[in-house]
Amino acid sequence: MPTLTPPAGSEVIPFASVHTERVEDCLVFPSELSTKVRLGGLVTAVSGGILGAALLSQTSSQGVAVPALLMGLSFVGGLLSTWSPCGYSSLCLLRPVGPYSARSLVKYTPTFLLHGIGYAVGALILGCVLGIAGGLLGFGGVSFGALAGLGAAGIIYGAHQLGFLRVPYPQRRAQVPHDARQRFPVWFIGGLYGLSLGLNYLTYVQTPILYLVTAAAVLSSNIGAAILLFAAFNAGRFLPMAVNYLPVSDITVQNWLARRQEGAALLDGVLLVAGGAALLTFAAL
């Protein structure tokens, strides 16, 4: 047993070792996808985007097909943003307090609802600002130039996500304020985090689909359309919080996300390329 060295003439004091709980190092990491897999995703996305747009053009007008495509892309982009640092943080920090029970879930519900309201307010603010900005800049909604520009951006950023290109992706590299938990009740934190994340540009968002949604909102020059686009994106960001109503531990959720980080990036790239190819096809038709 180790001892503490005493001053001269003093009694030797035994020092018993103390076992402390610790978090084990992560031993399982997502493997990097091969070039063959990423290239296959790129080719499949281009083919699927072109074919999908051609089929849609036979059954519906561009005025219906293009908004539907952008809304779907926005929603899935919101889901994929769960793999951003703040997505991990929110799922971890905004959990029911205490053992899993009906009582803890009831007490958690105001936090969950206020988190969703925060996202809704964020979509409302962003949609109004970007829709008005588009009108002031003179954009006129769906046009050849708008479709071609959005399509090219989708393919370029999709190739970026797939690792074939490196293009600028400026983001504010910040997270929600973790210390707020020490100063405010958890229901207030739920609303605060929802608003911070719902504004999308206050914190880091991993998916470039956010850029496509922003550009589409501005180009629409329509406040209602811009709000709907960000409502879809923010709904995708918010819905994963519902996992906290299930009897699963925080570490289980975090590990599930971590093991699928590369897969999420692959899906992100494939969707961007497919969406871009579809928009370019609509522009050409």
From Swiss-Prot:
Transmembrane residue ranges:
39-59, 63-83, 120-140, 144-164, 184-204, 209-229, 265-285
Q: Which domain of life is it from?
A: Bacteria
Q: Does the keyword Transport apply?
A: no
Coiled-coil spans in chain: none
User: What would be one Gene Ontology cellular-component term for the protein?
Assistant: plasma membrane
- Coarse class of the primary localization is membrane
Q: Which UniProt keywords apply?
A: Cell membrane, Membrane, Transmembrane, Transmembrane helix
Question: Which pathway does it take part in?
Answer: One-carbon metabolism; methylamine degradation
Subcellular location as annotated: Cell membrane
Membrane protein topology class: Multi-pass membrane protein
Q: Does this entry carry the keyword Protein biosynthesis?
A: no
Put simply, this protein is called Methylamine utilization protein MauF
Q: Which species does the entry assign this protein to? A: Methylorubrum extorquens (strain ATCC 14718 / DSM 1338 / JCM 2805 / NCIMB 9133 / AM1)
